[in-house]
Amino acid sequence: MQQVLNADAQVLGGITEWKKVADLAMSSHVLLAPHGDQEIHAHLVASVPNGLIAEYYDNNTNALLKDMFPEPIRLNELGQIMVPQAPGLGVEIEYERIRPYCTYSSDDK
C-alpha cells in the first residue's frame, strides 16, 4: 500500500520546512498531497518528484478567497492546477479587500 503524507506548509512553518519534510518523505518513498493553501502548495507539489496532488478550491465559492485573490488559480482543460508563472508565488493579494476579515493587524498600535 502506498503511503501519502498530507504535509501543510503553513502548519510546518513555511516553504523551507515543507521542502525538508518532502525530502524526508521521498527518502521513504512517501507521496505528498498537502491540504489547502493552493496558492502555495501548487508550486511545492510541482517542485518535487513525490508530489502527488494539490487540493483546489474554487475562489468563487468562498468570499474571503475571492476578495483576497482577484486572479484565482486556474485549471487546464484536464482539470489540473496551472502553476502560476508570475514572480514569487505568482499571485497578488488584495490587502485592502481583506481588511474587514482581519481580527488583528501589525498596524494596530
Outline where the language-model segments fall.
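C-terminal extensions of enzymes
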Residues: 68-109
